[in-house]
Design a protein with these regions (language model features):
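Mid-chain, well-packed structural core segment of small domains
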Residues: 68-99
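Conserved Class I S-adenosyl-L-methionine
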Residues: 98-119
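Short, glycine-rich nucleotide/cofactor-binding loops
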Residues: 57-67
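Flexible, glycine-/basic-rich loop-and-beta segments that form/coincide
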Residues: 9, 134-147
Length: 147
């Protein structure tokens, strides 16, 4: 599905040739658009578990408490220059969530991550792209500077 913009979802998420991508808790409905080799750019390596490093991480989350627990390890996966997409159900979706863009920012910003893009994934999911602030990119990833 090209979504609202007409662009392929892989392009909207910044998944380019040769990238390492982690798709975490990918909903079954999105498998045809992200989870199959035929739709991905050439040479993309896909992982389904957290850990290690990745150029792009797309994490589907429905609970703020779970995001709080996972934001540190997820941020470390994309340090220093990758992109972390946090996807959550839209308000109009039938999926239950306590997440909004405001909650994602409240969790991410104090830890050194800043949002720079938003993506309408499909009719049920929206996502915010987080990257490390420029001043954090030169050293080591802050493990969890707020808590």
């Amino acid at each position: 599905m090209a979504g609202y913009s007409g662009s392929p979802l892989t392009r909207k998420l910044g998944i380019g040739e040769g990238a390492t991508v982690a798709l975490l808790d990918l909903p079954a409905a999105l498998e045809p658009e992200l989870g199959t080799v035929s739709v991905l750019p050439s040479g993309v390596r896909v992982r389904r578990r957290a850990g290690g490093t990745a150029d792009v991480v797309v994490a589907f989350v429905t609970a703020a408490a779970r995001l709080e627990r996972r934001i540190g390890p997820l941020g470390a996966m994309v340090f220093p220059a990758g992109g972390l997409w946090i996807a959550w159900p839209k308000r109009a979706s039938s999926l239950v969530t306590d997440l909004t863009d405001h909650v994602v920012r409240e969790v991410a910003l104090p830890r050194g991550l800043v949002d720079n893009k938003v993506c309408a994934v499909d009719d049920d999911w929206t996502a915010l792209r987080l990257v490390w602030r420029v001043e954090h990119r030169g050293g080591t990833a802050p493990l969890d500077p707020v808590r």
